[in-house]
Amino acid sequence: VPVPLNYRLADQEWAYIINDSEAKLIIVKGNEYSDRINQISSELKNIKKYISISLDNSIEKFHDFYDWLSDSSNEKPALKIDENYDVYQMYTSGTTGHPKGAVLLQRNVAANIRQYLNSLTLPRPSRTLLVAPMYHAAAMINMCGCIAIGGTIVIQEDFIPQDVVDCLANEKITHTVLVPAMIQACLVSVPNVASNEYNDLDQIHYGASPIAPETLKKAMDVFKCKFGQGFGMTETVAVICLMTPEEHIRAIEEKPDLLKSCGRPAIDTQVEIRDENENPLPVGEIGQICAKGPQIMK
């Protein structure tokens, strides 16, 4: 079961997550991360093997990724996967205490892919730009949704506005997932953003915060594509609510307040706003968001 690590966390936070998840194997890229792991290796209780990609073979404890692969069996594992098997464990920071590990099952991920694709229909063939960090729920739904329809994933390690714009224009990208701040950065900091042609770009999806009407309108004018929004959290794979491209057009043309909404509940999902005693609240009241659906973690 993979456990993606946020590379921005402190070493001791890494140690906590690695131990709490009972991980047996660590795979890192490059010497920077292998050096950091070596500094905490004495604290790691369950790790049996350390693997590094692009290693210069001089780091203690670490084995080369490709050597490790070549030594592995070509036989299909004698394992029958069912809907209740774990797919991954992703850590999310709570309001207090240590990060919490959300365990997502095969049925959770499959359900959320179906919900995502039902509201935000992807073009076929599909080719997505994955620039959201891969320890984040947004990256998971972007990646899994594309894989589910046999699409291609183009990965960029870091968010660099010029690189993102160039990729959207030149790599036949059909869709991507960004946050509004990333969209805004592409619009204001890339000199050629408006002069490029984005002939294959069909959709940009966003989340994490509302998008300003002026940002959305400018993005629609520049990229000439549809926009969709997802709202959710790590514990729900990715989304519990979605706002369709049609609703974004309506927001721009007649009702900008729609952009303050997190969208409508995904199919097979119940969403309520409740008070501290779990009582449902009327429209317009502030409370806690409660959700029930097949995408919720076990």
Question: How would you name each of these model-derived features?
Answer:
Residues 87-111:
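Conserved AMP-binding A3 loop
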